[in-house]
Design a protein with these regions (language model features):
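Conserved alpha/beta catalytic core and glycan-binding cleft of carbohydrate-active enzymes
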Residues: 1-170, 182
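Glycan-recognition and catalytic regions of carbohydrate-active enzymes
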Residues: 58-70, 127-129, 133-142, 167-238
């Protein structure tokens, strides 16, 4: 979230998660632009191009989600292998009110294209459990708290979603599963989706391509450039 490139200098961390990659692709895949996605709602293809070429999208620009406060530091000088990219992870799914995966939020063709970007770009790809099986089961926010803490977490979570358009109505927020209920945990077990074999084959093919044609050239890799070529299309070169 801070997009602090200083942590990736020599002697620091080898790589860090890049939430900007997830956020801009989520906007392109789902059309959602509420809350922190507002920072990526405008010209998302251009923002994705910057992400692929330079790492962070926000490199000191003001964040609409944070009332214009500047976010991030310059990162274009860093190798793409300093960034960990992902379409889903436990935070981004689990922090959704209903824990939906991209398999139920967008159409398969778009998700296949995004998966190809994830696995064939030089950044380090991160996969979340259930991705390779096309799982459609939710991954909900669940805890094992009790008494006052359990009540505070339950109500605090519902208040948190008041800023999302879909949960502005208190009745809608009442549908958010109780994090402390056993049923919330049980519902979060990943199960193979109806097209699991197709998704496994796609991942197998893309990972093979990555190992054969991408990984041997990652040492010293740097971006040459990237640009948007349409409302949801990007050309990138490394």
């Amino acid at each position: 979230e801070r997009n602090d490139a200083a942590r990736l200098r020599d002697g620091g961390y080898d790589a860090q998660w890049n939430d900007d990659f997830h956020n801009v692709l989520h906007v392109l895949l789902t059309g959602e632009t509420s809350a922190y996605y507002t920072d990526f709602a405008d010209r998302p293809a251009e923002r994705l191009a910057r992400c692929l070429a330079e790492g962070f999208i926000y490199q000191g620009e003001g964040s609409a989600n944070h009332d214009g406060t500047p976010r991030g530091t310059p990162s274009a000088h860093l190798s793409p292998t300093r960034f960990v990219s992902f379409l889903q992870n436990h935070d981004q799914i689990g922090n959704r009110a209903l824990g939906e995966r991209l398999t139920v939020l967008t159409d398969p063709a778009k998700l296949r294209a995004a998966t190809a970007v994830l696995l064939l770009a030089p950044q380090i790809p991160l996969l979340f459990m259930g991705d390779t099986d096309g799982s459609e089961t939710p991954f909900l926010f669940f805890t094992d708290f009790h008494d006052d803490l359990a009540d505070a977490v339950r109500e605090g979570r519902r208040k948190e979603f008041a800023k999302f358009d879909a949960f502005a109505d208190p009745q809608a927020r009442a549908r958010i599963p109780d994090p402390n209920a056993r049923s919330t945990f049980e519902a979060s077990r990943p199960e193979p989706g109806p097209d699991a074999a197709t998704w496994r084959a796609l991942y197998r093919d893309l990972i093979t391509l990555r190992m054969t044609h991408i990984v041997p050239h990652l040492a010293g890799a740097m971006a040459i450039g990237a640009e948007a070529t349409g409302d949801a299309a990007v050309t990138a070169r490394w």
